[in-house]
């Protein structure tokens, strides 16, 4: 279900498969430790960690190195490859979950081909601590199945679940609560403990056999309900995670009974997928991400093909890497340590190579020196992306040229950076001073988002700057669909009381409410031009795709790719927001609206390129060429707003 969820074909709540995995993992590891304790009266930690090294490290090393290699061809050298390199390094030390928690980049959370390794990091962090605790219990003469041990585990689980609930609901007891609830190991531990407690329970007695079939059926229905109805608006993990967690626990507990349902679950196709599940999980997401990049117009077929291809790669990994190493009895003691060193050093060394190649290798120097690419990262873009195009800064503050008593000020999130060239050109042409202040991932809203620590601080800075500059025209641009359709963890807009939206329609109501509060505040006392979000592009990195197909000699594919238009209907959430905003702004005389679709699109389709050059540098941000196409439209909107020709 996780794989189908990632393909986008089915199961909006397929992410609950990870929670099922945590329960199963807690159960399996506890059974192994209980068996060892019963046979030897102790837990040999060195043997345990040696087995984990042989089981986990070789396969994840193979997948990480393979992903790094493919990223050279399928990801942009302008920041994305660095993100993958950093993720690979964090994943090598099983710290990917902390890495993602600390990131503010939408791309790092949404489209990173190593994003899925956060769950492996959580599992290994649990494995690092739990056996040690059981070892300490053993030294204290506490049996694993004793009442005291069970009560201690239940207390920890209740605490973990409680904090998870509050964090998932956005409670500010810790920074970036929604992200911490999702990625934080302490708030996932209760899911493992449920599996541990099932392992500590005696097998279901025969007198309960009559319950097996209905309980298993109900559990399967509950799982299907959760994967079908949960989505990005579900406050997760929180209380919602209890459905897949306890359903999985019941399936494990009653699964030993021979019923029609258990025999179906144990059928050969499911057994095969179970055997390759670890490597399949490691490989499916990177291949899906790369399929989206190389075949952007194929939203369903390419990801499905990638998922099927990952089955073959996973089978190869199982037969040639996992099983030979895991079953090698000669790999003991110091040899296991050497294996661990090799598995850690290899992706670290390869990540260094990819980092170097992203600036010097495989023809990418030519790509970086391409005039079109350079134009996409102008002086104004350096304000957003740092001193070099690989170093993204979180905020921008800049004032340049023009008459001091007439100022156009541009504010917003990263979307504002994509329009900085156009608005700066309008200011220059009409003798305005131009000022900017925008923060990556922080939209201009009355209620600052909680998923980033600094959004409230940036909003306060922006407000201070607006009051200080007192602009003649305030230009606002947000990538609105990111905050309305649940595209990012914790990024969904809330109402002024902090209430989370249940779906995108309620989120849209909150978005309009926030606009209403903003427009009635003293922030927008000036004339205001709202630049609405451009339609989405199907191509994540068009220039890189052009280079990719040129490298493999498929020039026809390049030409066809750049001739393709994208349907305006593909931006349905964006279109819904644009309509609602326009309706609201009619009520305010000091507000003008400019929709980039009026330049990019006809009634049905939108251009992604002009004269062979891309208008987008990713799926949603305009290149300088795309931005400058907006100059006339923005000029007319501002002229009408301030009654100037």
Regions found by a protein language model. Give the residues of each.
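Membrane-interface helix/loop caps of multi-pass membrane proteins
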Residues: 1-331, 345-349, 644
């Amino acid at each position: 279900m996780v794989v189908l969820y990632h393909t986008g074909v089915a199961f909006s709540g397929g992410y609950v498969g990870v929670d099922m995995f945590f329960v199963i993992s807690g159960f399996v590891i506890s059974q192994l430790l209980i068996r060892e304790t019963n046979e030897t009266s102790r837990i040999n930690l060195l043997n345990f960690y040696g087995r984990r090294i042989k089981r986990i490290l070789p396969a994840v090393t193979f997948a990480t190195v393979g992903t790094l290699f493919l990223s050279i061809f399928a990801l942009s050298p302008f920041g994305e490859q660095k993100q993958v390199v950093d993720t690979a390094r964090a994943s090598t030390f099983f710290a990917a979950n902390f890495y993602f928690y600390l990131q503010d980049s939408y791309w790092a959370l949404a489209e990173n081909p190593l994003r899925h390794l956060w769950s492996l990091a959580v599992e290994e962090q649990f494995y690092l601590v739990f056996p040690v605790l059981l070892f300490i219990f053993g030294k204290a003469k506490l049996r694993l199945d004793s009442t005291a041990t069970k009560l201690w585990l239940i207390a920890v689980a209740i605490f973990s679940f409680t904090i998870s609930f509050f964090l998932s609901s956005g409670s500010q007891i810790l920074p970036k609560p929604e992200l911490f609830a999702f990625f934080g190991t302490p708030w996932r531990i209760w899911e493992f403990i449920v599996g541990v407690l099932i392992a500590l329970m005696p097998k279901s007695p025969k007198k309960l056999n009559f319950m097996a079939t209905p309980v298993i059926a109900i559990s399967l229905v509950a799982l299907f309900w959760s994967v079908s109805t949960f989505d990005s608006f579900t406050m997760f993990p929180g209380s919602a995670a209890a459905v897949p967690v306890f359903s999985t626990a019941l399936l494990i507990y009653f699964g030993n009974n021979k019923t029609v349902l258990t025999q179906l679950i144990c059928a050969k196709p499911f057994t095969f997928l179970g055997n390759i599940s670890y490597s399949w999980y490691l490989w499916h997401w990177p291949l899906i991400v790369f399929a989206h990049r190389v075949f952007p117009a194929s939203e369903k077929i390419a990801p499905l093909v990638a998922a099927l291809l990952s089955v073959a790669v996973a089978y190869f990994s199982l037969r040639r890497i996992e099983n030979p190493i895991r079953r090698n009895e000669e790999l003991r003691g110091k040899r296991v340590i050497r294996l661990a060193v090799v598995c850690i050093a290899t992706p670290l060394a390869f990540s260094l190579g990819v980092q170097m190649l992203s600036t010097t290798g495989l023809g990418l120097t030519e790509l970086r020196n391409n005039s079109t690419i350079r134009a996409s990262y102008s002086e104004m873009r350096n304000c957003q992306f740092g001193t070099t195009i690989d170093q993204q800064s979180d905020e921008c503050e800049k004032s340049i040229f023009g008459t001091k008593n007439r100022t156009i000020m541009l504010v917003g999130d990263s979307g504002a950076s994509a329009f900085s060239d156009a608005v700066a050109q309008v200011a220059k042409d009409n003798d305005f001073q131009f000022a900017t202040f925008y923060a990556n991932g922080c939209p201009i809203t009355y209620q600052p988002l909680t998923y980033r620590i600094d959004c409230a601080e940036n909003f306060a800075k922006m407000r201070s700057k607006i009051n200080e500059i007192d602009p003649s025209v305030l230009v606002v641009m947000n990538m609105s669909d990111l905050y309305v359709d649940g595209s990012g963890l914790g990024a969904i807009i809330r109402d002024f009381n902090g209430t989370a939206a249940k779906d995108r329609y309620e989120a849209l109501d909150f978005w309009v409410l926030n606009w209403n509060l903003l427009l009635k505040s003293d922030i927008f006392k000036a004339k205001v031009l709202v630049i609405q979000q451009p339609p989405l592009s199907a191509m994540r990195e068009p220039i890189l795709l052009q280079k990719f197909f040129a490298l493999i000699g498929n020039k026809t594919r390049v030409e066809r790719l750049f001739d393709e238009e994208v349907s305006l209907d593909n931006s349905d959430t964006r279109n819904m927001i644009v309509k609602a905003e326009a309706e609201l702004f009619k009520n305010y005389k000091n507000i003008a609206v400019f929709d980039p679709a009026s330049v990019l699109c006809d009634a049905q389709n939108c251009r992604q390129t002009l004269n062979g050059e891309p208008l987008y540098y990713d799926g949603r941000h305009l290149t300088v060429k795309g931005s400058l196409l907006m100059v006339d439209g923005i000029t007319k909107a501002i002229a009408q707003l301030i009654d100037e020709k």
